[in-house]
Amino acid sequence: MLERIKDSFTESIQTKIDASEALPESIAKAAEMMVQCLLGGNKILACGNGGSAGDAQHFSAELLNRYEIERPPLPAIALSCDTSTITAIANDYSYDEIYSKQIMALGQPGDILLAISTSGNSGNVIKAMEAALSRDMTIVSLTGKDGGAMAGLLSVNDVEIRVPSNVTARIQEVHLLAIHCLCDNIDRTLFPQDEQA
């Protein structure tokens, strides 16, 4: 068991090293898109399932509250939080529509959808992306493996942050790090700090 635990740490470290080579440009581009979205008076909607829903909530909390510096709240909504809305849509229509219907109501041109799925094949996240595109929103996707069906929906205006791994747990670990990098870039671009302070 101890060896298995050590192997998990080693795999996680190696995946992060691989990601540190593969992802900085896409993370930086996504952060810049988010900064421009927020400067334009728009908001960021986020969605995912399971651990990815938790990541969507984590991202939203960092923007609404703060990441590492004191600053005003920034507009972000995790679409996985309203259980009454989610269960009503799932019951009356289908689980695949729990995010898309919210986006049709809340999404505006210029908003960003942060779509999170380790496989890139989550049906409700794909429907969310389709709804976002119909609302003239931009998409930042956090995926892994081969990017799944989500990769095929992205245009040159969108950004995919695809973790170079096929292991769900390792992908989730890098997703959290990527979210922290996004938050850090957003904060430091919108609210520059004296690095020596």
Curated annotation (Swiss-Prot):
A Pfam family this chain is assigned to: SIS_2
GO BP annotation list: carbohydrate metabolic process; D-glycero-D-manno-heptose 7-phosphate biosynthetic process
Residues involved in substrate binding: 49-51, 62, 91-92, 117-119, 122, 172
Record-stated family: Belongs to the SIS family. GmhA subfamily.
GO cellular component: cytoplasm
Residues that, per the record, bind Zn(2+): 58, 62, 172, 180
Function recorded in the entry: Catalyzes the isomerization of sedoheptulose 7-phosphate in D-glycero-D-manno-heptose 7-phosphate.
Keywords, in A-Z order: Carbohydrate metabolism, Cytoplasm, Isomerase, Metal-binding, Zinc
Entry's EC annotation: 5.3.1.28
Reactions performed catalytically: 2 D-sedoheptulose 7-phosphate = D-glycero-alpha-D-manno-heptose 7-phosphate + D-glycero-beta-D-manno-heptose 7-phosphate
Pathway membership, UniProt: Carbohydrate biosynthesis; D-glycero-D-manno-heptose 7-phosphate biosynthesis; D-glycero-alpha-D-manno-heptose 7-phosphate and D-glycero-beta-D-manno-heptose 7-phosphate from sedoheptulose 7-phosphate: step 1/1
Name used for this protein in its record: Phosphoheptose isomerase
Organism encoding this protein: Shewanella piezotolerans (strain WP3 / JCM 13877)
Location of this chain's protein in the cell: Cytoplasm
HAMAP family according to UniProt: GmhA (MF_00067)
One GO molecular-function entry: carbohydrate derivative binding
Residues of the SIS domain: 34-196
Required cofactor names: Zn(2+)
Cofactor-binding details, from the entry: Binds 1 zinc ion per subunit.
More info: The reaction produces a racemic mixture of D-glycero-alpha-D-manno-heptose 7-phosphate and D-glycero-beta-D-manno-heptose 7-phosphate.
Subunit structure: Homotetramer.
